[in-house]
Amino acid sequence: MEITASLVKELRERTGAGMMECKKALVENAGDIDAAAEWLRKSGLAKADKKADRVAAEGRIATAQAGGKAVLVEVNSETDFVAKDENFLAFTEVVANAALNSDAADAEALKSVKLDSGETIEERRAAVIAKVGENLQVRRLVRIDSANNVAAYVHGGRIGVLVELKGGDIELARGIAMHIAAMNPPHVKASDVPAEFVAKEKEIELAKMSEKDKAKPAEILEKIISGKISKIVNEVTLYGQPYVLNTDQTVEQAVKAAGADVIGFQRLAVGEGIEKVVEDYAAEVMKQAGLA
């Protein structure tokens, strides 16, 4: 069968692969476009395997929501350049929507979720790797499914937050989500702070005190320490922090004024916890030249 330009173009549009790759696939499969597409998919999987050991620490946080059901996904790339690529961005949206419409509990379970095209998320990932030339990872998935107010907020594609708010309204929930994105509180309220953390901070504050202060009566010393610990606890709790949308009140005051309560939240930031590889090209060149 003759391999025409229109056939190559059709396969390219269908798979997103390069023109020369599409032509080769058609030649290898006697012009059968379905077989050629499958051949490219298999080729894409091979390329994905070669890139699997590269560190993917850039990327994007994407969200999808339907009423009180919302998800955040983190999809990683190796470079910020690819994180802005239209193929990568489209893939993150596909992943987020697939997560929303599935019952996958985590990123590992999400890999086997099937798309309308019949592909799994993992197969689509491999196909996108073939297009962009970098290792990509669907790293994390978090979700909230509730009858309460649920807000999803993504800042610049780098930080994403889900908030569940009992009472109040969706506008307040979104404001709280924006605050969490900006301030990154580890806990909702003081009662959520581990006792071990409080004990350690007391120990640190006591060690920092002067001998003169340590000599004060026990009840006075306890008040001084308690005041310092209260300030620290406020810093690490959502409720204790000044509300970024109105710094005249704390988040707790804003929430309670609306007769509401924050049930919980999820926050993801691109690449957190991933150790990035720092390339020392000068040292690499010297090593290759036998100078190091």
Curated annotation (Swiss-Prot):
Job of this protein: Associates with the EF-Tu.GDP complex and induces the exchange of GDP to GTP. It remains bound to the aminoacyl-tRNA.EF-Tu.GTP complex up to the GTP hydrolysis stage on the ribosome.
Stated family: Belongs to the EF-Ts family.
Gene Ontology MF terms: translation elongation factor activity
Keywords: Cytoplasm, Elongation factor, Protein biosynthesis
Involved in Mg(2+) ion dislocation from EF-Tu: annotated span: 79-82
InterPro entries reported in the protein's UniProt record: EF-Ts_dimer_sf (IPR036402), Transl_elong_EFTs/EF1B (IPR001816), Transl_elong_EFTs/EF1B_dimer (IPR014039), Transl_elong_Ts_CS (IPR018101), UBA-like_sf (IPR009060)
Claim: Cytoplasm is one of the keywords in the record: yes
Coiled-coil boundaries: none
CDD domains in UniProt: UBA_EF-Ts
GO cellular component: cytoplasm
Tree of life domain: Bacteria
Keyword Translocase tagged: no
Protein name: Elongation factor Ts
Gene of this entry: tsf
Source organism of this protein record: Xanthomonas euvesicatoria pv. vesicatoria (strain 85-10) (Xanthomonas campestris pv. vesicatoria)
Compartment(s) where it occurs, according to its Swiss-Prot or TrEMBL record: Cytoplasm
A Pfam family the protein falls into: EF_TS
